[in-house]
Curated annotation (Swiss-Prot):
The modification Phosphoserine is found at residues 14, 51. The gene is HBE1. The keyword Metal-binding applies. GO terms for molecular function: haptoglobin binding; heme binding; hemoglobin alpha binding; metal ion binding; organic acid binding; oxygen binding; oxygen carrier activity; peroxidase activity. One of its GO terms (biological process) is hydrogen peroxide catabolic process. Residues 3-147 form the Globin domain. Keywords: Heme, Iron, Metal-binding, Oxygen transport, Phosphoprotein, Transport. Heme b binds at residues 64, 93. GO terms for cellular component: blood microparticle; haptoglobin-hemoglobin complex; hemoglobin complex. CDD domains: Hb-beta-like (cd08925). This is Hemoglobin subunit epsilon. InterPro entries: Globin, Globin-like_sf, Globin/Proto, Hemoglobin_b, Hemoglobin_oxygen_transport.
Amino acid sequence: MVHFTAEEKVAITSLWSKMNVEEAGGEALGRLLVVYPWTQRFFDNFGNLSSPSAILGNPKVKAHGKKVLTSFGDAIKNMDNLKTTFAKLSELHCDKLHVDPENFRLLGNVMVIILATHFGKEFTPEVQAAWQKLVSAVAIALGHKYH
């Protein structure tokens, strides 16, 4: 289990409270699909993913990205209990969807990039460290069923 300090929790929640989940979710998932094109195989029912502009403009990518970031909000509300929070999603992604758990780490790293671009100077090294810790812990929790 990962322990978050009070300072880390404040750094995470204060930035999250300013996040536009719909916009950032589509951007994060879209960036994942563009930068790591092999992840597209999990989204073959999303229609046109033939180019970066097609991916970033795809309404299914945006909708699923919002869903992903909404789930990420659950992590922020339950930072002290991530394994339980993501148990069902871990099972779904492992047993039904067969997603490579490495993709969770990649998505977390994309999230950190999105935060940096959206929040600029507010995204200090200390804030980045807190967020990196969180996205790593979420990736581990999502990959739990695989072990």
